[in-house]
Structure formats: structure tokens, C-alpha cells
């Protein structure tokens, strides 16, 4: 949520920032509602003052034994007028909320201009795209040949965009999850959390999924819960409504994630790249505002370390203003090389939300002057486990169809060096 005081005092500044996203703010409507609010509040204050004065005069008249009938009638009329104005103010504030709750975050000045992913800026590469002395196969062909990926079973059990991992495939997914959690907790200083996989509407509102993205969520039919689309939701909400005594706070969690992919019809229909259910290790940091820029770089480096230890070539891109997520002020994407697709694909988004989520969450700390101030929140995937499995299969495939296990992962697979049929 954007700062209401900024929206009221400098709507043109907000409009200019949102225009970089190619989002048009209706400044005239915003100003009209604010002027209406001010006028109603002034009228209400005057009427309430008059009511208080009338009450004082009625009390004084009664003590003097005077007739107060006319005065009481006038006070009753005043009360009805106050009630009408209060209802008008309530409607005006609701209209303001409806208009402003759908406003995305303002991009940081360092975010490149652009309309969509074609305008994102590549910042750096790690490693070179894998090359082979044979035609590389994609993870679907590799996994099915090894008997470790079963899309037919996933479709039979649930439907399209589901998969079953078997044997070494299931073990590999478990090993990747454990490897990521151990790295982030023992080397990067995160506290591991085991959260619920269901969330209420308040939690999803706090992180920005509701109300705007409800169509992409799986909702329970008879209970007021949603399946979480990412562990960002429970992790960021852990301290909702609190004044945090100590910063920074770093949380990580493994969870399955559930997404309807309502806007992805026809995209990535082959393989495990886009699933309704997928596993992910999530990183969340809660920091002081002056520390959030550096925290963003640090969090991104933590996600990069996973790829480096797994010997997976990748690149880091800065998302342009038009491609930013709704709540983000700045985002880096990590894109891993997939030989089977002959292209880089996103495997992690690392974002700084500044105070956007914290304002919804009423998540604060005490500044040096003792006054509560909003924190800044950040998160990123560290990593998406299914896409990491895909990248590992494709980048470490051998000519005979076996998969080489990178050294960092072998302790989690009982010393296994290859996966083979």
C-alpha cells in the first residue's frame, strides 16, 4: 500500500512514478475524493462542536429550571445531520480505499525504464551456457527415460500441470530442498520456519496477493482459507501488527506452492516449468529502511550461491519498471540456463518492497527517537526446487542419459555421483 499522506500531498509525484510502470493514476478522481473527505470532516467537526455546546447549554438550563424542549429538538436534528454526514464520510473513505488499494508500488529510481520483459537489463553472467558433444535432451525426455518423472500419473491423479516424481527423482527433490535449507540456515543466517500451507485473507492482503490477484489463488470451498501461492505469505506475516524489537529478521521456509496460473493458458505446457503445485525454498528479510538496499543485494547473493554450488550457469537481470510485480519497488531475476530449451529461464525473483507490504501489515520498529516506523520487507526464492531439478538434469546430463550429481549435493544423496536407469 502506498503512503496515503504522499497520495494526498503529492499525487502528481505518485502519478509520475506509476507512469514508469505504464500505469495511469486518476489524479483528478483522487483529488476530488480527498477534497470531499476534507469538507465532510470540517462539517462534522463543526456539528460535533455545536452538539457539545448545545449539551452544555441544555444542562445549564435544566439546572436553572428552564424549559429545554426547543433546545432538545434542535439537538436531535443536529444528531441526525451528524449521522448522515458520518455515513457520507464512510462512503467517501471506502471509495478512496477502492481507488488506492489497487495502486502498485512506485519503482525505485535505479529501476530501468521499459514496458515488459523484453526491456529487462542483464547485469551479469555466472558460468557459460553448457555445451555438449551430443544433442542435449530436455528434462522431460531425460526424466522419462530414467523412470524418475511421470507426467501421465500426475495427469491421472490430478490433471494437467501436475507431475509425479519417482525413486531417484523424488529423492533428488528432497535432497535439493535439504541442501538449500542447510545452506541458508547455517551459512546465511536465516531462521527456518515450518509454516501452515493455508492462509487467511488478512495474510494474503498483507503481502499484496489480495484483492488484486484472487483469481490466481486456490480457495477452499467451505472455509475462509486459501492454499499459499508462496511461503512469502506466511513468512512476511509472522510479525504482522507487531513493533519488532530487533532487526534484521531473516526467515526461510520450504513449502509446496499452489497457483491456478489463470493467465498462463498455452504457456509452458510441456514439462515441469509451470505447475499448479511446486516446491520452493523462500527467503524473507525484514530490515530498517536505511538497510534495505544492501539487504536486497545480500539476499540476491544468497540465492545465487545455490546455483553456484550446483554448478548451474545463470544470469542476473534487473526488471524494468513495466515488468515489476505489483508490490515490488525493485526486482532482480535469476535466470538459469536450460540446454533443453536453449535459453535462460527464471528460477528466482528477489524483490525489495520497501514499506509497501509493511504498511498493509502494520509491521513496525522503534526508530532512535522512540517512535514506531514502518520496516522494509524483502523476499526471494532460494530456490524454486522443481526448476532447480529441471536445470540440474539438463545441465549435468551425459551422453548415455545418466545425470552427474554436483559435489555439493552428493552428501544429501548418500554419496551418489550419478543418477542412472
Swiss-Prot record:
GO BP annotations listed: selenocysteine biosynthetic process; seryl-tRNA aminoacylation
Molecular function via GO: ATP binding; serine-tRNA ligase activity
Presence of the UniProt keyword Ligase in the record: yes
Main location: cytoplasm
Top-level lineage group: Bacteria
Protein's pathway: Aminoacyl-tRNA biosynthesis; selenocysteinyl-tRNA(Sec) biosynthesis; L-seryl-tRNA(Sec) from L-serine and tRNA(Sec): step 1/1
Enzyme Commission number(s) of this protein: 6.1.1.11
SUPFAM superfamilies: Class II aaRS and biotin synthetases, tRNA-binding arm
Pfam families, alphabetized: Seryl_tRNA_N, tRNA-synt_2b
Family: Belongs to the class-II aminoacyl-tRNA synthetase family. Type-1 seryl-tRNA synthetase subfamily.
Domain notes: Consists of two distinct domains, a catalytic core and a N-terminal extension that is involved in tRNA binding.
Name the UniProt record assigns to this protein: Serine--tRNA ligase
Amino acid at each position: 500500500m502506498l503512503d496515503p499522506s504522499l497520495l494526498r500531498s503529492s499525487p502528481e509525484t505518485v502519478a509520475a512514478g506509476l507512469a514508469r510502470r505504464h500505469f495511469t493514476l486518476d489524479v483528478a478522481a483522487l483529488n476530488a475524493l480527498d477534497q470531499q473527505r476534507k469538507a465532510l470532516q470540517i462539517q462534522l467537526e463543526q456539528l460535533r462542536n455545536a452538539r457539545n455546546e448545545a449539551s452544555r447549554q441544555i444542562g445549564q438550563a435544566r439546572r436553572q429550571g428552564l424549559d429545554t424542549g426547543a433546545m432538545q429538538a434542535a439537538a436531535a436534528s443536529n444528531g441526525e445531520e451528524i449521522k448522515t454526514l458520518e455515513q457520507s464520510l464512510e462512503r467517501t473513505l471506502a471509495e478512496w480505499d477502492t481507488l488506492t488499494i489497487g495502486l502498485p508500488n512506485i519503482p525505485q529510481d535505479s529501476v530501468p525504464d521499459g514496458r515488459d520483459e523484453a526491456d529487462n537489463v542483464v547485469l551479469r553472467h555466472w558460468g557459460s551456457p553448457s555445451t555438449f558433444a551430443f544433442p542435449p535432451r530436455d528434462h522431460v525426455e531425460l526424466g522419462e527415460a530414467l523412470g524418475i518423472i511421470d507426467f501421465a500419473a500426475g495427469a491421472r491423479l490430478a490433471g494437467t500441470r501436475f507431475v509425479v516424481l519417482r525413486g531417484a527423482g523424488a529423492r533428488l527433490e528432497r535432497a535439493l530442498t535439504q541442501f538449500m535449507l542447510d545452506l541458508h540456515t547455517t551459512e546465511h543466517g536465516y531462521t527456518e520456519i515450518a509454516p501452515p500451507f493455508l492462509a487467511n485473507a488478512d495474510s494474503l492482503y498483507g503481502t499484496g496477493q489480495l484483492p488484486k490477484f484472487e483469481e490466481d489463488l486456490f480457495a477452499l470451498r467451505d472455509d475462509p482459507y486459501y492454499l499459499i501461492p508462496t511461503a512469502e505469505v506466511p513468512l512476511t506475516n509472522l510479525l504482522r501488527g507487531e513493533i519488532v524489537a530487533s532487526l534484521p529478521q531473516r526467515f526461510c521456509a520450504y513449502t509446496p506452492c499452489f497457483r491456478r496460473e489463470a493467465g498462463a493458458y498455452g504457456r509452458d505446457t510441456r514439462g515441469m516449468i509451470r505447475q499448479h503445485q511446486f516446491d520452493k525454498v523462500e527467503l524473507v528479510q525484514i530490515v530498517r529502511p536505511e538497510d534495505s538496499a544492501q539487504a536486497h543485494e545480500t539476499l540476491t547473493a544468497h540465492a545465487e550461491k545455490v546455483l553456484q554450488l550446483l554448478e548451474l550457469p545463470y544470469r542476473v537481470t534487473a526488471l524494468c519498471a513495466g515488468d515489476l510485480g505489483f508490490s515490488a519497488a525493485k526486482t532482480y531475476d535469476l535466470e538459469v540456463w536450460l540446454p533443453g530449451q536453449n535459453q535462460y529461464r527464471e528460477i528466482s525473483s528477489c524483490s525489495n518492497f520497501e514499506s509497501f507490504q509493511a504498511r498493509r501489515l502494520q509491521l513496525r520498529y522503534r526508530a532512535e527517537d522512540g517512535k514506531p516506523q514502518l520496516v522494509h520487507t524483502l523476499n526471494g526464492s532460494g530456490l524454486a526446487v522443481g526448476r532447480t531439478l529441471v536445470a540440474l538434469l539438463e545441465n549435468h546430463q551425459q551422453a548415455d542419459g545418466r545425470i552427474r550429481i554436483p559435489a555439493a549435493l552428493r552428501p544429501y544423496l548418500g554419496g551418489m555421483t550419478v543418477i542412472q536407469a
